[in-house]
């Protein structure tokens, strides 16, 4: 019998519902249960694929090509269970399906309403594709009281009534703000949040209280009294220095055991060895290595969430603290680049879209190459590395990408360039995914290359999100100038990896390795990149 756990939030957004859901799922997994995590987002976009990173943060790509919320990255990193298109839904996707069904006449002339038609689609999403799982954890985006979230709260309220307590549990995450002048945590916002949740028919079974310091027993008892919850089910969520400390903190407070007790399930011992190993490695990470990220959205770190985490994972692997140096690519010039990158041990250019800030990134590639600083280019980062090499090593001074320029030598071209049915005027928000290469694809690596040696195998599968590729017409001239093409798609039409073997570590990949990195299984390319940065640090 599958059991459903709904995680909601109140008081403020960005409290850590995703981390709480991921941590609990991992803890249940450690007790031998099979878990599934899902995110329900109340915004009207069909998916986050075309949303501005300033608005949404990173778009997390799954194996099956779904463009999803960044919280699914947390889910995968904590549990190791691959997410899929069935694990994320938005209000936009709900209404898109609803209107399609209505136009097809599938509602047989009924008045289509939020209740029951919208809520039924949400319920169907939650209850479908659950075979083989012991627990399905659903995170509801936003906070209680948000008008756009009401259909989702109504849907889970109905599920709670239909399944009863034997199959359904509600966890509510709130904030206990600390008022310095009063020198105490304030419980009133939590009381009001629970009250708001109850007005829509949901009574939380477990209350998780986020705070910046330890919560006193008297404060827990006060919260329990006014929120009508047993003190045993009021769980502290104290700020941690590292997100990978969160699961064991919840375990210490007994969150996993309280959930099993609620469902009247046997409380088995937890197998948490690999998480204890992570904690020990973090404690032993005294030395530092500095990695510069040449970013377009340097002020919004969530736009590069998986890259940040993948670097952290490599640091955990090597028992090194990875200090990130954020560089605004728009402000990089020939005159200031040496000052901006002074003292860094590695340079990373992440993926992205749009022309803005690309020339600054190209300058950073040049600085890494000419100073033999370890370099890692991902997706657009690889393409810009190819342009830098073309301009300054191969001699093609007018090298450009077709994505931004119509004039010049097009080192980077559109994947669909040779598709007979392709028409540039057809690229709209509605059909833009038709030109995008999304999801996992097999890559064949070249033996005795940096990339192949990192993986330890010649056939790999990695996730992609791009519509442009290296122009294979220039492969020969690049090779004559020392470039090694170390990875190709199965049909050999798409270059998947390039490298400069004579340098300490210079690798560009078309795919997104960061999406597959985990704290207990760091991605091999990030392991080798950070390893090269450590070596550079020791020698300079």
Swiss-Prot record:
Pfam families from the UniProt entry: CTP_synth_N, GATase
Binding site for CTP: 13, 146-148, 186-191, 222
GO molecular function: ATP binding; CTP synthase activity; glutaminase activity; identical protein binding; metal ion binding
Ranges of residues in domain Glutamine amidotransferase type-1: 290-539
Enzyme class: ligase
Statement: the UniProt record of this protein carries the keyword Oxidoreductase: no
CDD domains: CTPS_N, GATase1_CTP_Synthase
Residues at which UTP binds: 13, 186-191, 222
Catalytic residues, chain numbering: 379, 512, 514
Binding site for L-glutamine: 352, 380-383, 403, 467
Protein EC: 6.3.4.2
Transmembrane segments: none
Any one GO CC term of the record: cytoplasm
Activity regulation annotation text: Allosterically activated by GTP, when glutamine is the substrate; GTP has no effect on the reaction when ammonia is the substrate. The allosteric effector GTP functions by stabilizing the protein conformation that binds the tetrahedral intermediate(s) formed during glutamine hydrolysis. Inhibited by the product CTP, via allosteric rather than competitive inhibition.
Protein residues bound to Mg(2+): 71, 139
One BP annotation, GO: 'de novo' CTP biosynthetic process
Region of interest called Amidoligase domain, as start-end residue ranges on this chain: 1-265
Matching Gene3D superfamilies: 3.40.50.880, P-loop containing nucleotide triphosphate hydrolases
Alphabetical UniProt keywords: ATP-binding, Glutamine amidotransferase, Ligase, Magnesium, Metal-binding, Nucleotide-binding, Pyrimidine biosynthesis
Pathway involvement of the protein, from the record: Pyrimidine metabolism; CTP biosynthesis via de novo pathway; CTP from UDP: step 2/2
Quaternary assembly: Homotetramer.
Family label: Belongs to the CTP synthase family.
Chain's role: Catalyzes the ATP-dependent amination of UTP to CTP with either L-glutamine or ammonia as the source of nitrogen. Regulates intracellular CTP levels through interactions with the four ribonucleotide triphosphates.
Other facts: CTPSs have evolved a hybrid strategy for distinguishing between UTP and CTP. The overlapping regions of the product feedback inhibitory and substrate sites recognize a common feature in both compounds, the triphosphate moiety. To differentiate isosteric substrate and product pyrimidine rings, an additional pocket far from the expected kinase/ligase catalytic site, specifically recognizes the cytosine and ribose portions of the product inhibitor.
Protein known as: CTP synthase
């Amino acid at each position: 019998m599958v059991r459903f756990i709904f995680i909601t939030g109140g008081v403020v957004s960005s409290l850590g519902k995703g981390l709480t859901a991921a941590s609990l799922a991992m803890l249940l997994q450690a007790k031998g249960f099979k878990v599934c995590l899902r995110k329900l987002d109340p915004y009207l976009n069909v998916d986050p694929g075309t949303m501005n990173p300033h608005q949404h943060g990173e778009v997390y790509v799954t194996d099956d090509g779904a463009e999803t919320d960044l919280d699914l990255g947390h889910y995968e990193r904590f549990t190791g269970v691959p997410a899929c298109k069935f694990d994320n839904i938005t209000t936009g996707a709900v209404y898109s399906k609803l209107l399609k069904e209505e136009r097809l006449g599938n509602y047989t002339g009924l008045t289509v309403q939020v209740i029951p038609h919208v809520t039924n689609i949400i319920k169907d999403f939650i209850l479908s594709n659950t075979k083989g799982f012991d627990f399905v954890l659903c995170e509801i985006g936003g906070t209680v009281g948000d008008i756009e979230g009401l259909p989702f709260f109504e849907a889970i309220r109905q599920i709670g009534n239909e399944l009863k307590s034997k199959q359904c549990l509600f966890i509510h995450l709130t904030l206990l703000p600390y008022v310095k002048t009063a020198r105490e945590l304030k419980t009133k916002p939590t009381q009001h949040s629970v009250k708001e949740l109850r007005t829509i028919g949901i009574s939380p079974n477990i209350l998780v209280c986020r705070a910046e310091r330890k919560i006193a027993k008297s404060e827990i008892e006060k919260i329990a009294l006014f929120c009508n919850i047993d003190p045993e089910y009021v769980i502290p969520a104290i700020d941690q220095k590292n997100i990978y400390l969160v699961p064991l903190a919840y375990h210490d407070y007994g969150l996993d055991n309280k959930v099993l007790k609620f469902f009247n399930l046997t409380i088995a011992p937890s197998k948490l060895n690999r998480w204890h190993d992570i904690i020990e490695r973090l404690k032993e990470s005294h030395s530092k290595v500095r990695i510069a990220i040449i970013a377009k959205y340097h002020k919004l770190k969530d736009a590069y969430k998986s890259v940040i985490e993948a670097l952290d994972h490599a640091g955990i692997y090597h028992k090194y603290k990875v200090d990130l140096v954020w560089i605004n690519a728009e402000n990089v010039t020939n005159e200031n680049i040496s000052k901006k990158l002074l003292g860094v041990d590695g340079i990373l250019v992440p993926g992205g879209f749009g022309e803005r800030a690309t020339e600054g990134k190209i300058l950073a590639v040049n600085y890494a190459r000419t100073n033999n600083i370890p370099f890692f280019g991902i997706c657009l980062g690889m393409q810009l590395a190819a342009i830098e090499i073309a301009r300054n090593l191969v001699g093609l001074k007018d090298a450009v990408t077709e994505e931004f320029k119509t004039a010049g030598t097009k080192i980077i071209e559109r994947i669909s360039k040779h598709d007979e049915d392709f028409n540039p005027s057809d690229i709209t928000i509605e059909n833009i995914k038709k030109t995008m290469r999304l999801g996992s694809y097999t890559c064949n690596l070249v033996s005795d290359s940096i990339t192949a040696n990192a993986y330890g195998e010649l056939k790999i599968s990695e996730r992609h999100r791009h519509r442009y590729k290296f122009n294979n017409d220039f492969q020969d001239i690049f090779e004559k100038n020392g470039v090694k093409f170390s990875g190709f798609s199965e049909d050999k039409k798409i270059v998947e990896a390039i490298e400069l073997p004579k340098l300490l570590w210079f690798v560009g990949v078309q795919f997104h390795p960061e999406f597959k990195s985990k704290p207990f299984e760091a991605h091999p390319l990030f392991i080798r990149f950070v390893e090269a940065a450590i070596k550079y640090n020791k020698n300079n």
